[in-house]
A protein has these predicted regions:
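Interfacial aromatic-anchored transmembrane helix boundaries in multi-pass membrane proteins
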Residues: 3-41
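Membrane-embedded alpha-helical hairpins and interfacial helices in multi-pass inner-membrane proteins
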Residues: 46-129
Length: 132
């Protein structure tokens, strides 16, 4: 049921945004729609290499998509962070976002390796049940 791979994360994010009082940001939902197929493909063959590559690709996609929307929605009232609607504006937008990219990448690598590693440990472990 691949549709659940899309529905559950998007619904969970939407509900958490609403319950926390955050305005849902369409750019984040769109980024997730591009990232979820990477996770679906990753499930077919989980290796250190595939986890590493998937984490990097997901971080790059998230960076490109969300910051493109930041640039599109930028206005002069943003002051120092204003990115004009030009080639230099989008370049400025992406340059300003680089520190956030590294945090996203490190988070992806940490959580992907932790979660997939934990899954591998649990799935290969044999549990012995003792009746008392």
């Amino acid at each position: 049921k691949k549709y659940l791979a899309f529905l559950l994360p998007i619904a969970a994010m939407f509900l958490s945004d609403i319950s926390l009082g955050h305005k849902p940001l369409i750019s984040i939902y769109i980024a997730f729609l591009f990232i979820i197929p990477i996770g679906i493909k990753l499930r077919k063959k989980i290796t250190y290499f595939s986890i590493f590559n998937s984490s990097i690709i997901a971080a790059i996609l998230f960076f490109l998509i969300t910051n493109f929307f930041v640039w599109i929605n930028s206005s002069p009232s943003d002051g120092l962070y204003y990115c004009p609607p030009s080639l230099m504006g989008i370049i400025k937008c992406y340059i300003q976002a680089i520190p956030f990219f590294f945090n996203t990448l490190l988070g992806n690598l940490f959580y992907c390796f932790s979660l997939f590693g934990l899954y591998e440990i649990i799935s290969k472990r044999k549990f012995i049940y003792i009746n008392s």
